[in-house]
Amino acid sequence: MAEITAHHGLFKDTDLHVDDTGGSGRPVVLIHGWPLSGESWKEQVPAFAEAGYRVVTYDRRGFGRSDKPLTGYSYDTLTEDLHTLLTELDLQDVTLVGFSMGGGEVARYFTKYGADRLHSVVFASAVPPYLMKTDDNPDGPLEKAQAAQMTAGLTKSEDDFYDQFTTDFFSVDGELKVTEEQRQEAIALAKQSAKHAALACMTAFATTDFREDLPNVSVPALVIHGDGDGTVPFEGSGARTHAAIPGSELHVVHGAPHGVTVSHPEEWNRVVLEFLAK
């Protein structure tokens, strides 16, 4: 366990909580989804460490055990935080694994910082290329009315919102694909977030356009997604990301919800570890 400090101009230091398995293995940085924390990777960290990798997780600003500043929730700043992590820990030859919202930092990283530190990347149930349906993004899977409803729901009641959100997160066609205990763990992680951060990041992942970032991905890439994902539907996200990154690999986890890392950890870990070994 450690903390790194992200610096953004004068008096803008933000401490980020980091967990690092250490060791001399090639580093894998796991970037969590909204509105969870690095603890959401507990089905992955031991398996990846056992396979010989140095596994680094961190809590995004505003979430988990990290500082919760009032500002800094654009993808440019969030990606700057990721870059600070890589430079502070002096990580090279890194695989970035971005789950859901975390795929945004992965996409934006190439545009801002290039690929010098990177070995490969994984877009896992990830939000790129662009969630919000607009006139010039007709394939966006998120309707503006849906986004407004989410914002209103979280603003009104965190308890009610996270109860419904985690149910959808882990369900396929109304059937929960994890245990109730696992769903409750996700609710507990969500409640560690600051509401202002959760709302700001909701806007960021819904409205940020990554279509110009994806062609900059210049290392091997894997897209892995559940075909029963009702939160970030595959056809409007993972399928398009795979098409936008020449040479990318695609693995669809059949019958899997958005929260596939918890519902289908054996298959998910096997596929990602096979990709990491390349």
Residue ranges and their predicted role:
Residues 32-34, 94, 98-100:
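Conserved alpha/beta-hydrolase "nucleophile elbow" surrounding the catalytic nucleophile
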Residues 77-94:
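Conserved acidic catalytic loop of the alpha/beta-hydrolase fold
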Residues 107, 111-112, 116-156:
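Flexible "cap/lid" loop of the alpha/beta hydrolase fold
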Residues 132-141, 152-215:
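Conserved alpha/beta-hydrolase catalytic His-Asp/Glu region
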Residues 217, 223-225:
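Short beta-strand/loop motif that positions the catalytic acidic residue
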Residues 227-232:
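Acidic catalytic loop of the alpha/beta-hydrolase fold
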Residues 246-278:
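Catalytic active-site module of serine/aspartate enzymes centered on a nucleophile-bearing elbow/loop
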